[in-house]
């Protein structure tokens, strides 16, 4: 079982190598990189390319590791017992299977996405060490042990909001998705806009990469934001020359909102555009 990329996702050779290394080693693949570099989409593409199910677990600040295994709905059972419902006699009626349980009982290969693991409490990764290592866990309420007959491919993403525990890192294969260079970015854009006018793409790309290099930029625009910007330019039929117009009044209104996401960067962008145009 090897991942060779897909037509809808530009995977660099080193990224494909990382995916296949994790599969060979039977270890979780920990993916880091700037927001918008395709970390989450990678799991979807791996599952699609290999023709296997994808089970997604999107982590929040309140997420607990137990939720990935199962949850026992004691409140519903208490309510049903008060109503005299017969199903209270079978405690399994109140067990809600988590993503890991669902993957373990597939009986065939699958992909588990644990998305943005760094959003959770610092102990969250450690609480999953045994389960991800042994691919099994115990259900105390029913006295079952749930084991994976076929080991799933586990892809874990992180935006580096907090450091992950060393014990967790030792059990993962790590890959950092570098921000795409101009050539790779063109390939990514071609996937989304195969018939885009090259002069418009060239101007938009220049503005995009210039913005990323501006000193003092609080949040650099990402790949997904470039795609949004191009969608707006195409939808509004904006000519390429409008991106370089010396008339400040013709600055494309959607452009700043697609690429820049806070007022400090917007004001910085406006000042730089104004100065650059009047120095030409």
Q: Whereabouts are the PLM-identified features?
A:
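C-terminal regulatory/interaction module of P-loop NTP-utilizing enzymes
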Residues: 1-280
